[in-house]
Every structure is written in structure tokens, then in C-alpha cells.
């Protein structure tokens, strides 16, 4: 009975942890893009994103990770024979890497709070998809256990990565084209303003003459 309680709260922890990771790095994307904005929008947005990231990391993401790990340990204490299963050993290795990813996000958060941006928005989008791949593989391991079809899983994960890469590239292209259109529409207005200023200056010279 204790095992089932531990398992239930382990699943709750996983849901909370992954939800926090997905949203946290998405905030990183917006934070980096806010750095490209002119003042005062840049400072206002960055300050807001720093507050949101800090609260999300401390109040949701980290507690979710702790609950996941603690409940997993409790499950292993009640049923230590599970440690002999290959699928669980692989799953634990993936979770260890995911914990490293979790702490890497904390490092990026501190860097951005210090106005240091090591990654661009597109790189952040790539980083944001890492938990998706881990989630898929971990869930498949938990469901199929030692019966997981490795060939199908490998091809499926590869297809997922290719699809995510295509989406990221398409969005980057769309964003670049939108910027070019915005710049193109802004140039004529700037030219008109320059012409008006020049005409006003010329008129002033004529009146002075």
C-alpha cells in the first residue's frame, strides 16, 4: 500500500516538475527577446521576467523535482529489487541528466538577472525542447519497462527531434521576415520625416533671407 502512495505522489511530482521546466525555459526565450527591445520597454520587461522566473523556479519547478526524487527513493526503499531492472537503471540515468538540466537553467537564470545573455532566443527554443524528449523516453520506459521496443523508440525520438527542429527553423524564418517587413515599413516614414525636416529648414532659411 505504501508503494502505491509513493508512486502516486511521484507522478504528481513529475507533472509539476516538467510543467515548471517547460514554462521556465519559455520565459527564458521571452526574456532574451525582451533584451532586443528599446528602452524603457527593455528594462520593464526584463524586470518582470526575472520576477516570474525566480518565483517559478523556487515555488514550482524545484519543489516538483524534490518531490519526484524523494518519492522515487521511497519507492525503491519499499521495493529494492526494482534496482536490478535495466529499464529502471536507464530511467534513473535520464533523470540524473535532467537534474543537471534543471540546475543549468538556474545558472542561466542568474546570468540573465546579471544582464548576461549566453544564448540567443533560437538557442533557448532548442533548450526548451530538451525536456520533451526526456519526458517521452521516460514515460515509455515506465510503461513498457524491459519490453520497450528500442528500434521503434529510437526512430520515434529521432522523428520527434526532426519535427521540433523544423518548427524552430520555420518560426525563426517567420520572425526574421516579420522584422524585415517592419523595417521596410518604418524606412519610408523615417524618410518622410527627414524630408519634412529638410523642407522646414529650407523654408526658415528663405524667410531669414
Regions found by a protein language model. Name each.
Residues 1-209:
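Polytopic transmembrane helical bundles with strong interfacial aromatic enrichment
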Amino acid at each position: 500500500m505504501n508503494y502505491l502512495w509513493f508512486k502516486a505522489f511521484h507522478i504528481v511530482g513529475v507533472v509539476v516538475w516538467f510543467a515548471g521546466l517547460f514554462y521556465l525555459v519559455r520565459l527564458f526565450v521571452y526574456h532574451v527577446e525582451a533584451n532586443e527591445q528599446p528602452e524603457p520597454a527593455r528594462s520593464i520587461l526584463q524586470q518582470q521576467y526575472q520576477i516570474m522566473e525566480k518565483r517559478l523556479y523556487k515555488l514550482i519547478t524545484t519543489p516538483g523535482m524534490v518531490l519526484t526524487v524523494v518519492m522515487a527513493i521511497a519507492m525503491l526503499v519499499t521495493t529494492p529489487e526494482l534496482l536490478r531492472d535495466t529499464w529502471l537503471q536507464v530511467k534513473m540515468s535520464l533523470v540524473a541528466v535532467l537534474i543537471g538540466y534543471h540546475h543549468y537553467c538556474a545558472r542561466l537564470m542568474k546570468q540573465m538577472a546579471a544582464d548576461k545573455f549566453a544564448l540567443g532566443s533560437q538557442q533557448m527554443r532548442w533548450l526548451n525542447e530538451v525536456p520533451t524528449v526526456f519526458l517521452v523516453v521516460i514515460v515509455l520506459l515506465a510503461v513498457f519497462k524491459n519490453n520497450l521496443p528500442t528500434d521503434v523508440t529510437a526512430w520515434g525520438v529521432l522523428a520527434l527531434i526532426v519535427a521540433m527542429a523544423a518548427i524552430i527553423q520555420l518560426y525563426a524564418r517567420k520572425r526574421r521576415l516579420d522584422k524585415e517587413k517592419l523595417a521596410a515599413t518604418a524606412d519610408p516614414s523615417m524618410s518622410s520625416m527627414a524630408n519634412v525636416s529638410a523642407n522646414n529648414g529650407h523654408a526658415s532659411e528663405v524667410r531669414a533671407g
